[in-house]
Amino acid sequence: AGAATHIIIAARTSGDQRSKKGITLFMAEVGSQGITLQNYPTIDEYRASEVIIENLKVSKDAILGKVDEAYDVIEEEVDKSTIAACSEALGILEVLKDATTDYCKNRKQFGQPISKNQVIQFRLVDMMMEYEQAKSILYMAITSDLSNPDERRKTVSALK
């Protein structure tokens, strides 16, 4: 949020705490009175911010979508974000799988590569199967009908 000029806020506008109805999305300028950002660095050199909202007042023009109807929109975007995060994780997994395989082919013990050891081969096969399964589920998620909430939830649950 450190570089953002606006933020989207989900707020309960009616109903009780557990109700799916009653959540509304608002857009507010970062410099608005009632919004404070506390920026901090992250381990991977990205920037992050804690957004503190206190007594923020917004006009009706700040409403995004329909009043009290944002729950399903938020759920859909969380699911899409989960697919994106899993896609990144799969890329990391591929790099680790390839690096491990290369290491096992090049590392020698008792005059031969450790990849000749049957136990190592079993583990490499297990790792490859887990990777291929994750990749297949990711492809299924990407090509599924994300506009269908039931199908989207099932697919994202399988992907996690």
How should these model regions be labeled?
Residues 16-21, 146-152:
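Short, glycine- and charge-enriched coil/turn segments that flank and shape catalytic ligand pockets
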Residues 103-111, 139, 143-149:
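Surface-exposed helix-capping loop/turn segments at secondary-structure junctions
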Residues 1-36:
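A short core secondary-structure module
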Residues 125-147:
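Active-site pocket-lining segment
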Residues 35-132:
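Glycine-rich beta->alpha junctions and the first turn(s) of the following alpha-helix
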Residues 150-160:
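Charged, glycine-rich active-site and insertion segments that engage polyanionic ligands
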Residues 3-5, 45, 118, 155:
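Residue-level preference for beta-strand/loop junctions
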